[in-house]
Amino acid sequence: AASDVYKRQAYNSYVILDEKTAVMDTVDANFKDEWLENVAKVLDGAKPDYLVVQHMEPDHAANIENFMKAYPDTTVVANTKTFTMMGNFFRNLNLDGKKLVVANGDSLTLGKHVLTFVFAPMVHWPEVMVTYDSTDKVLFSADGFGKFGALDVEEDWDCEARRYYIGIVGKYGAQVQKLLKAAATLDIQTICPLHGPILTENLGHYLEKYDIW
C-alpha cells in the first residue's frame, strides 16, 4: 500500500564540504524542518555556495524554495529542463543571477572536489541527471540504485531494491542501460542514491542486478 511505502521510505540529501560547499538535492515537503536543521548542523555556520538539483520529483525537489529562503545567496545548479520544471513548480521563486545551467558532461570545481554531470533522461523523469565526484569516486545516482525501506532497519538490499526498481524505473530499461554504460566508464567506489542506504562495498553486485532486472 502507498501508506506502507511512505512510512518506510528514506529521503537522502548530501553535503559536500570544500572551498565551495554544495548541497545535493532537497527532500520531501513533510521533512522540511528536520532537513533544514540537519543541513545547518553539517554546515556549522558556513553558507552553501551551490544547490545541485538532479531530479524534480516532489519528494526530492519540494524544499528548493524553502532552502533558497534560508540561504538566498546560493547558486542553483541544474540543467535546462530542470530549470523549466522548477519555474512551473515554484511560481514565486526568483533565481535571477542565481542559476548555473549545466550541459551533459559539464564539470564544476568546488576546490579539491570536481563534480561532473551526466544526463540520465527517463531514469525515471526526463530531466534527471546524476553527478560524479572524481575526487572521492562517488556517484550521486538520483533515483538510480535506490530502495524502499527505512535506514534504521537492517534488511537485504536486493529484495526491496528490486521492488523499487520494478515500481520506479523498471519500465525505462533502455534508459537504465545507457546509464549503466556511462557508469561503467567511471571509477566508482561509492553510490549515493536519493532513497535507501549508501552503497560502498561490492558495487559490481548492484550494477549487475540493475543489468539483469
Question: Which sequence ranges carry the predicted segments?
Answer:
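Metallo-beta-lactamase
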Residues: 78-201
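Active-site metal-binding motif and surrounding structural segment of the metallo-beta-lactamase
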Residues: 19, 30-77
